[in-house]
């Protein structure tokens, strides 16, 4: 099994998944306004539209992870991409905020492409190269997630917001086909005699305190990274940006992705050499300091520069967590652990 070939194919799939999910970020609050929300309810529904996907994904992800351990990671990747083709593309046709929230909830229910691709590569890459492999893979979703808004802002500015959702649906269908014909997995399901429950799986992990700490760290990292996204356009507007608001918002969000591309692979190799836990601690400290500067930005340009610098640190965060998880997790339960 050529794990490097799968790595780059999964990288491209993750890039399109990340881009598809983030293309809507620059104008989500404006789309909510278009659907009829007014005043303070715009921020509320914008935040709900984004967080509802994360909520249902968090609840259902362990279920998909368990199925991946039984039937393979590739089928779960195909399922996620194909289902999201309709849940994301259908956002172009919603008549009001209620149906927007419903489809966003369903999008989270059927998600799971990224954690299953991560589990796939983690199960195939040699342990000594896990930092490099997972660091490289993470640049795909990070780059897509943070460069997607620039493309989304440009398309929304010129063609209208609803057409962006149709484009997203097309991207996700391409990812479905790409995964079917590109990803190779020699999966051997665990026999029922050797099958372990989730409780037994956790009992087999000796470093339970480390596992719990990594779960908390992962949750905090993703919460910090996504918390500002629903209202970033409104924040940039409050800093004085009036013209080309969607384009500027997309560029500022994407600045973080550009720097993450440069840093993730290199930092992944550095983590393999110096220890992923040391690199993770340094990256957390660095990101904390830069995030404070983001809050004190006085102009859109300053915010863009700070977001770029912040991205340099994020290149070591989730890859570092994934690499450490891979090292302490039994092979037979890697999809379930990564789904959490």
Task: Describe the role of every protein-language-model region.
Residues 87, 98-106, 290, 301-309:
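Paired small-residue
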Residues 164-181:
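Symmetry-related core transmembrane helices of the 12-TM Major Facilitator Superfamily/SLC fold
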Residues 59-95, 271-277:
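Conserved MFS/SLC helix-loop-helix module at the cytosolic interface between two early adjacent transmembrane helices
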Residues 1-3, 184-214:
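Juxtamembrane intracellular "pre-TM" segments in multi-pass secondary transporters
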Residues 27-43, 231-247:
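Short amphipathic helix-loop junctions that connect adjacent transmembrane helices
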Residues 3-30, 34, 208-227, 308:
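Pair of pore-lining "gating" transmembrane helices in MFS-fold secondary transporters
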Residues 48-64, 254-266:
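Central cavity-lining transmembrane alpha-helices of secondary-active solute carriers
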Residues 103-141, 324:
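Cytoplasmic helix-loop-helix junction between adjacent transmembrane helices
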């Amino acid at each position: 099994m050529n794990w490097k070939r799968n790595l780059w194919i999964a990288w491209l799939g993750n890039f399109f998944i990340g881009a598809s999910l983030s293309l809507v970020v620059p104008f989500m609050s404006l789309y909510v306004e278009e659907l009829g929300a007014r005043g303070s309810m715009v921020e509320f529904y914008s935040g709900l539209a984004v967080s509802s996907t994360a909520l249902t994904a968090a609840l259902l992800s362990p279920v998909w992870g368990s199925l991946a351990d039984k039937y393979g990671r590739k089928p779960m990747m195909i399922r996620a991409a194909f289902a999201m083709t309709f849940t994301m593309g259908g956002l172009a046709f919603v008549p009001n905020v209620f149906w927007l929230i419903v489809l966003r909830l369903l999008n989270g229910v059927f998600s799971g492409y990224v954690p299953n691709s991560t589990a796939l590569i983690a199960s195939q890459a040699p342990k000594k190269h896990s930092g490099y492999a997972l660091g490289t893979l993470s640049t795909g979703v990070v780059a897509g997630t943070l460069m997607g808004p620039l493309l989304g802002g440009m398309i929304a500015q010129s063609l209208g917001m609803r057409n962006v959702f149709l484009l997203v649906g097309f991207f996700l269908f391409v990812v479905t086909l790409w995964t079917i014909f590109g990803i190779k997995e020699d999966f051997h399901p665990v026999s029922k005699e050797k099958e372990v429950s989730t409780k037994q799986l956790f009992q087999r992990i000796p470093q339970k305190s480390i596992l719990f700490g990594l779960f908390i760290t992962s949750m905090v990292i993703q919460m910090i990274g996504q918390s500002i996204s629903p209202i970033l356009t409104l924040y940039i507007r409050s800093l004085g940006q009036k013209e080309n608001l969607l384009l500027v918002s997309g560029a500022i969000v994407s600045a973080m992705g550009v720097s993450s591309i440069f840093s993730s692979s290199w930092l992944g190799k550095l983590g393999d050499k110096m220890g992923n836990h040391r690199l993770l601690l340094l990256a957390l400290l660095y990101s904390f300091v830069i995030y404070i500067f983001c809050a004190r930005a006085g102009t859109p340009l300053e915010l863009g520069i700070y977001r770029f610098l912040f991205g340099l640190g994020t290149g070591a965060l989730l890859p570092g967590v994934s690499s450490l998880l891979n090292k302490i997790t039994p092979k037979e339960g890697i999809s379930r652990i990564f789904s959490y």
